[in-house]
Amino acid sequence: AAPLLLIISNSLKPLNELWEFPPRLIPRQPTFENYRNLASIMSGSLVPFAMYLANTVFVTAVGTGGHIILASMCAFPLAKKRFPGRQVIFNAIVIALMFSGTVTVISNYMVMAALGWIDSLLSIVVPAFSSTLGLYLMKQFMEQVIPDSLLEAARIDGASQWKIFWRIVMPNVKSGWLTLMLLSVQTLWNSGQSPYILSEEKKTLAYALNQIVSGGVARAGVGAAVMVIMMLVPITVFIISQSNIIEAMASSGMKE
């Protein structure tokens, strides 16, 4: 909590207090000047602040929703079905976790170019659907939380695979997809410039605010204000979801 409090404190400090040593947690003369300067800088931008924000909200909401749905649907057969090549597929997923996104930038660019998605928000949203971490996480949750006897009982009662997935599996792995939601929101909300986005009006809020942070020493306080703004959404989502995650973990602890 200390680094978070220090960032908030720095965003409320005038410039002459930012470089004091040792640093003070509570400003002597708290001010919102850094936030006013940030608003002034953004108002002078070629692209309105609302457009950066709208792009970020779209990318975060659609990317997170698609990621949760696709990861869960792919994890279900890997966790609860027995078919040839199942372990090979899972091993490939684990190996894919060893590589960073930088390794696949060139191949991803070639795919985006072939699909005509260069300079489109789809080039950020669609790759977010296929994160291997989400698939791995949901598979582990389903294996540990969902007993096979529960699924078998649902089949005996005449439930279809689709109904089993949406009515039984997803509610019982709520803690898993809420955790995945937190990770996805944090990643997408804070995603900076994409190599596939060229037009200024299609860039995200993180890119615009990072440009402000790079303005130099005179904007150090503004940089702290930027960090506070970028942390607001992930922290809010965490606070809202925390109790639900704990409740879901407690209520979904079923045994054979």
Residue ranges and their predicted role:
Residues A1-E256:
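A hydrophobic, multi-pass inner-membrane permease signature
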